[in-house]
Amino acid sequence: MDHAEQGPDRPGVDDPGRGRRIGIDVGSVRIGVASSDPDGILATPVETVPRSKDRGPDAPDIRRIADIVEEYEAVEVIVGLPQTLRGERGKAASIATVFAKRLRRKVDPIPVRMADERLTTVTAARALRESGVSARGQRPVIDQAAAVAILQGWLDERSRSVNAGDVGGDVQLPEAGQ
């Protein structure tokens, strides 16, 4: 799917069902990675991967993310698509889209989707600051926190879609407390 012209993906009929999802926040220097539990309810941080200057199909950053996808036995990868508040795209969106295309080729047949990530880094920084993490202390984890926000947003939307019957297959989310 070419994301150069269309908006971000949304959970829907092509949902792969139960399984872990990986969330990715692509930056120009670092990539934040998060994972969900197998039931797709809660996103947690995994690691921060340095961006590689190599933009080839076997670049170290792409390889590391592909290894994480395999290690976690992910059924879906969600890459944040940064847009302005008006839904416009800039350089950061182009970087994320190109990265997603490269990753898609590496992890095929696992689907790689783009999710709206407006303000996730701002929200993550605010949450870290409110939890007492200094600005300097945020650097190593801000990308992971943004990846968690991207993935949690996807999981929450997926849960609403499942409950509304918009997601195909035999997808059933467990009730709270199970």
Swiss-Prot record:
MF-aspect GO terms: nuclease activity
Compartment(s) of residence: Cytoplasm
Major site of localization recorded for this protein: cytoplasm
SMART domains xref list: YqgFc
SUPFAM superfamilies, per the entry: Ribonuclease H-like (SSF53098)
Region (Disordered), start-end ranges: 1-23, 36-60
Enzyme Commission no: 3.1.-.-
Keywords: Cytoplasm, Hydrolase, Nuclease, Ribosome biogenesis
Feature: compositional bias, Basic and acidic residues: 1-18, 50-60
Pfam families tied to this protein: RuvX
GO cellular component: cytosol
GO biological process: rRNA 5'-end processing
Family statement drawn from the similarity comment of this UniProt entry: Belongs to the YqgF nuclease family.
Function: Could be a nuclease involved in processing of the 5'-end of pre-16S rRNA.
Name of the protein in its database record: Putative pre-16S rRNA nuclease
Species: Rhodococcus opacus (strain B4)
